[in-house]
Curated annotation (Swiss-Prot):
One of its GO terms (biological process) is defense response. Its main location: secreted. Belongs to the frog skin active peptide (FSAP) family. Dermaseptin subfamily. This is Dermaseptin-9TR. GO terms for cellular component: extracellular region. Has antimicrobial activity. InterPro entries: Dermaseptin_dom.
Length: 29
C-alpha cells in the first residue's frame, strides 16, 4: 500500500543520509 511505499522511501532516505554523514566524517578525519 501507500504507507509501505512511504516507509520504504523513508528508509532509503535515512540510509543515504547516513552514508553521506559517514563520508563527511571520514573526509574530515
Amino acid at each position: 500500500g501507500l504507507w509501505s511505499k512511504i516507509k520504504d522511501a523513508g528508509k532509503a532516505v535515512l540510509k543515504a543520509a547516513g552514508k553521506a554523514a559517514l563520508g563527511a566524517v571520514t573526509d574530515a578525519v
